[in-house]
Every structure is written in structure tokens, then in C-alpha cells.
């Protein structure tokens, strides 16, 4: 059995640290992609009293949140019309991505005789989604004056927040500042928000009315940030499995597909029942590390869909079937932390955690 064990205490402590850091700004907690792989229902259930909003990528994720919490939920992505009636009935916040979408929302709201809560996404430079910057004020004005929309928020997203010195950050901030000025001229109550984790850590004066700290809440810090308070944030999860078999190699034998790993006579290998079919990175095969009984062991041979093997050498520490295996550590400096795994596989921690799928059990401890 493969289990992602999540520390409730660490999770809640991370959020409390963030809330202290951001002062009076509201906190919108992103739980998209199954709460970055940690399990959306468990994460929401254990944090809803600490945050103001939750944010997700689509309608189906939003329904999973509203099933366990009453907090406002903002959907970042495009809305699918087959779900829009349920979204409106549950007061799920819709993102307006272009001017024309306002009229479509109004028509549906009239049919339901219920107003729609909306946030307008402005493209200030990421060039992915959102109302064009040059059309922002017209769109905001139109939504604000609508009889069927409640314009609750206006937001944008930084393209280069992970590089705090990138000139695009200032360009986007300046554009957003002008939008904020226009928006606040209509109503001081409209929530303006721009920053994700890297954004409000790397840029000054960028919290506005609300921040959206996703990866930071789960315990992953940008390398550039050394603030003492924020450094108290810790990863919340460990991925664990069990040794299911010990194999002893004979002379000239190898292990796994294509037998790319060739061991020595008498070498012992531990078989672990987790593979890329569980969302664990296949690239780690033959170069990753796992922790068994506080000893690091290297992976040996190619990872398969349902399993991997690690070399125990001569097994001087007497690893046995049933021993616990730590595949992802909650200690960032360890060779099997999500940070280290991301470095080894040329990706980011978001990727490592969010691709862990439902073959892995999530357990809050």
C-alpha cells in the first residue's frame, strides 16, 4: 500500500505563517489539481477555518470544495456551460475571461433569477487567459453596472514571479495598478488580487486585497527567499510504501526492463510496489534514492508501471520485507525530497506532487 501522509499541524502552521506575513490581505488558497496532489477534500476540510477563499481550475473541482466547506470558491478557468447552473446555485465564483462572456452570464442568470458572483481576469502580460489589458476598464465597467452580476473581484497573474528581478514583473504590476485605481473608483469593496506565492514573496507592495499562495501553503519555498519567518514553512507530506520482496542477484544477472542495471553476485535488491502508473516520476529509475530505516538506497534499473527496485548492496542493515520505504521526504535537503526529485528530473515540485494519482492513498495525520 502506498500512502501520502499529510501533517495537519504542519499544513495549518504554514497557513498561519502566511497569514501573519500578508497582514490584512485576504487569503485565497488554491486547491486545484487535487490540492496539488495532496487530496482536495482532506485539505479543504482541515483549512477552511483559516482561509477566506478557495480557488480551483474548473467546475468539477469547485463542486468537490463546496461539498465539504462553505467558503467562497473561485474558478480560474473557462466555465463549461453544462455546469453553469449548478455553479450559480452554489454561489461559486466565475472568472470572466472576455467582454462577450458577460452577456452570456447575464442570460443564464436571468433564466435562473439569481445573480452571479464574478471575478474578472485581466491579461497584463502572461498572454494565456483573461480580458486584454486594453479592454480591461470597459469590461470592468460593464460587469459592475450589470443587474445580474456581482463584481466581487478583479485579478491578474504574474508570468515571471519565480524570477523576482525579471522586468516583466514591474510592467505587469504597473498595469495592474492602473486597473486597481479604476476599479476602486467604482467601488472600494471590489477585491483586487495579483500575487501567487512567488509574487508576494519576491515583490514589494503587491499583496493588494488578497493573495493566492498555492505551493507555499503546501510547504515549498522559492530558492531565492530567505526571510526568517517564511523559512519556518515546511513541506506537509511524505510518500511511503513497503518492501514487498528481497531479491539476491546471481553472477551476471540484472534487473528490470532491458536489464540496464547489472549488479554483482550476491547483491540484494528490494522491490517497492510503486511506479510511474502511480504518478511517480519514471525518470528517477536508476538514479533516484529512497529512505529505508534511515538509510538512503539508490534505485536500480528502470522503473516500471507498478514497481521499482533499489540496491541494498550486501544488505548490511538487514532490510526486510515489510519495512517502510520513504519515497518523498518532508525534509527539503534530503536526496528524496520533492525539491531534490524535481532537480533530478528537471522539473518543479508542483509537477512532482500534482501528478501523484488516486492509486496512492492520502492520509491526514
Swiss-Prot record:
<dbReference type="GO" id="GO:0005829">
    <property type="term" value="C:cytosol"/>
</dbReference>
<keyword id="KW-0663">Pyridoxal phosphate</keyword>
<dbReference type="InterPro" id="IPR001608">
    <property type="entry name" value="Ala_racemase_N"/>
</dbReference>
<comment type="pathway">
    <text>Amino-acid biosynthesis; D-alanine biosynthesis; D-alanine from L-alanine: step 1/1.</text>
</comment>
<dbReference type="InterPro" id="IPR009006">
    <property type="entry name" value="Ala_racemase/Decarboxylase_C"/>
</dbReference>
<dbReference type="GO" id="GO:0008784">
    <property type="term" value="F:alanine racemase activity"/>
</dbReference>
<feature type="active site" description="Proton acceptor; specific for L-alanine">
    <location>
        <position position="257"/>
    </location>
</feature>
<dbReference type="GO" id="GO:0030632">
    <property type="term" value="P:D-alanine biosynthetic process"/>
</dbReference>
<feature type="binding site">
    <location>
        <position position="305"/>
    </location>
    <ligand>
        <name>substrate</name>
    </ligand>
</feature>
<comment type="function">
    <text>Catalyzes the interconversion of L-alanine and D-alanine. May also act on other amino acids.</text>
</comment>
<feature type="modified residue" description="N6-(pyridoxal phosphate)lysine">
    <location>
        <position position="32"/>
    </location>
</feature>
<protein>
    <recommendedName>
        <fullName>Alanine racemase</fullName>
        <ecNumber>5.1.1.1</ecNumber>
    </recommendedName>
</protein>
<feature type="active site" description="Proton acceptor; specific for D-alanine">
    <location>
        <position position="32"/>
    </location>
</feature>
<keyword id="KW-0413">Isomerase</keyword>
<comment type="similarity">
    <text>Belongs to the alanine racemase family.</text>
</comment>
<dbReference type="Pfam" id="PF00842">
    <property type="entry name" value="Ala_racemase_C"/>
</dbReference>
<dbReference type="InterPro" id="IPR029066">
    <property type="entry name" value="PLP-binding_barrel"/>
</dbReference>
<dbReference type="GO" id="GO:0030170">
    <property type="term" value="F:pyridoxal phosphate binding"/>
</dbReference>
<dbReference type="InterPro" id="IPR000821">
    <property type="entry name" value="Ala_racemase"/>
</dbReference>
<feature type="binding site">
    <location>
        <position position="128"/>
    </location>
    <ligand>
        <name>substrate</name>
    </ligand>
</feature>
<dbReference type="Pfam" id="PF01168">
    <property type="entry name" value="Ala_racemase_N"/>
</dbReference>
<dbReference type="InterPro" id="IPR011079">
    <property type="entry name" value="Ala_racemase_C"/>
</dbReference>
Amino acid at each position: 500500500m502506498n500512502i501520502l501522509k499529510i501533517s495537519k499541524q504542519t499544513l495549518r502552521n504554514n497557513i498561519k505563517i502566511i497569514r501573519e506575513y500578508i497582514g490584512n490581505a485576504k487569503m485565497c488558497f488554491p486547491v486545484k489539481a487535487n490540492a496539488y496532489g495532496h487530496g482536495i477534500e482532506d485539505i479543504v476540510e482541515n483549512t477552511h477555518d483559516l482561509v477566506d477563499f478557495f480557488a480551483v481550475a474548473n467546475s468539477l473541482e469547485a463542486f468537490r470544495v463546496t461539498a465539504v466547506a462553505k467558503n467562497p470558491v473561485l474558478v480560474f478557468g473557462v466555465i463549461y456551460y453544462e455546469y453553469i447552473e449548478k455553479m450559480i446555485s452554489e454561489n461559486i465564483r466565475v472568472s470572466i475571461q472576455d467582454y462577450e462572456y458577460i452577456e452570456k452570464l447575464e442570460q443564464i442568470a436571468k433564466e435562473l433569477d439569481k445573480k452571479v458572483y464574478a471575478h474578472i481576469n485581466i491579461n497584463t502580460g502572461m498572454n494565456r487567459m483573461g480580458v486584454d489589458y486594453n479592454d480591461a476598464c470597459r469590461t470592468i465597467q460593464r460587469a459592475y453596472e450589470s443587474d445580474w452580476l456581482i463584481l466581487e473581484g478583479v485579478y491578474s497573474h504574474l508570468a515571471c514571479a519565480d524570477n523576482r528581478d525579471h522586468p516583466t514583473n514591474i510592467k505587469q504590476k504597473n498595469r495592474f495598478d492602473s486597473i486597481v485605481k479604476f476599479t476602486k473608483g467604482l467601488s472600494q469593496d471590489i477585491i483586487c488580487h495579483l500575487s501567487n506565492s512567488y509574487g508576494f514573496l519576491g515583490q514589494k507592495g503587491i499583496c493588494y486585497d488578497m493573495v493566492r499562495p498555492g505551493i507555499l501553503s503546501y510547504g515549498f519555498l522559492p530558492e531565492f527567499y530567505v526571510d526568517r519567518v517564511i523559512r519556518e514553512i515546511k513541506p506537509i507530506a511524505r510518500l511511503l510504501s513497503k518492501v514487498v520482496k528481497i531479491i539476491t542477484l546471481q553472477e551476471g544477472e540484472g534487473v528490470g526492463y532491458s536489464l540496464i542495471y547489472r549488479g554483482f553476485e550476491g547483491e540484494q535488491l528490494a522491490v517497492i510496489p510503486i511506479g510511474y502508473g502511480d504518478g511517480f516520476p519514471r525518470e528517477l529509475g536508476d538514479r533516484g534514492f529512497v529512505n529505508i530505516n534511515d538509510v538512503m538506497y539508490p534505485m536500480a534499473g528502470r522503473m516500471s508501471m507498478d514497481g521499482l527496485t533499489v540496491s541494498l548492496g550486501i544488505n548490511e542493515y538487514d532490510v526486510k520485507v515489510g519495512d517502510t520505504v520513504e519515497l518523498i521526504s518532508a525534509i527539503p535537503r534530503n536526496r528524496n525530497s520533492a525539491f531534490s526529485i524535481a532537480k533530478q528530473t528537471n522539473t518543479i515540485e508542483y509537477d512532482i506532487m500534482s501528478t501523484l494519482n488516486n492509486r496512492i492513498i492520502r492520509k491526514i495525520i
